[in-house]
Curated annotation (Swiss-Prot):
TM stretches of this protein: 1-21, 53-73, 76-96, 110-130, 152-172
Role this protein plays: Catalyzes the transfer of an acyl group from acyl-phosphate (acyl-PO(4)) to glycerol-3-phosphate (G3P) to form lysophosphatidic acid (LPA). This enzyme utilizes acyl-phosphate as fatty acyl donor, but not acyl-CoA or acyl-ACP.
Pathway in which this enzyme or protein is active: Lipid metabolism; phospholipid metabolism
Subunit description: Probably interacts with PlsX.
Ranges in a coiled coil: none
SMART domains to which the protein is assigned, alphabetical: G3P_acyltransf
Encoding gene per record: plsY2
GO MF, one annotated term: acyl-phosphate glycerol-3-phosphate acyltransferase activity
Subcellular location: Cell membrane
Recorded topology in the membrane: Multi-pass membrane protein
UniProt KW Transmembrane helix keyword: yes
HAMAP family xref list: PlsY
InterPro entries tied to this protein: G3P_acylTferase_PlsY
The protein, known as: Glycerol-3-phosphate acyltransferase 2
Organism of derivation: Bacillus anthracis
Length: 190
């Protein structure tokens, strides 16, 4: 059951809701539009707010669901491992030639299971940053940093380590966005 749990966690993470929503309902492969990223922000920019919200919610839920798999399947695998595999699946999707999204929403779903109050803190930072700057990328990075700071204060060492790993990954995956922010060429959300 443990191997099945691990495989399913990765495969669930690999499901690209941005690709599915784009192809099924809009007849568009969003990899060919906008940033080409298989995430909620590109879905929003290419397909509209409704699609962006649906993709964001679905990506969050898949992160949470992956963490629930050990409970559902009576597995001894730690939910953190399942969450990490879902995040890796989102970034390196087997269903999309190992090219996925930046996993911000999927990581949010994982932390919704592990640290709901930490996610609330991150969400507040995300919304405030987005309201003031209109940069989704900056909002995502600052929300991740806020979650890490929350974890340092209130969570155990494993959650602290995971939140550090996630924020470092998010920043690395957003390095082109950081360059564009510094150059003043990053797209703002309208």
């Amino acid at each position: 059951m443990n191997i099945l749990t691990l495989i399913l966690s990765y495969l669930i993470g690999s499901i690209s809701f941005a690709l599915i929503v784009g192809k099924m309902f809009y007849k568009k492969d969003i990899r060919d539009y906008g940033s080409g990223n298989l995430g909620a922000t590109n879905a929003y920019r290419v397909l509209g707010i409704k699609a962006g919200v649906i993709v964001a919610i679905a990506d969050i839920l898949k992160g949470t669901f992956a963490c629930l798999l050990p409970l559902i399947l009576s597995s001894t695998i730690n939910p953190i491992v399942c969450g990490l595999l879902a995040i890796l699946g989102h970034i390196f999707s087997v269903f999309a030639s190992f090219k996925g999204g930046k996993a911000v929403a999927t990581a949010t779903g994982v932390f919704l299971f592990l640290s709901p109050l930490g996610v609330l803190v991150g969400f507040v930072v995300f919304v405030l940053t987005l309201l003031f700057t209109k940069y989704v990328s900056l909002s995502s990075m600052l929300a991740g940093i806020a979650l890490f700071i929350y974890s340092l204060i209130f969570e155990d060492k494993v959650i602290i380590a995971l939140s550090l790993l996630i924020i470092v990954s998010i920043i690395i995956l957003h390095r082109q966005n950081i360059k564009r922010i510094l150059n003043g060429t990053e797209n703002k959300i309208v």
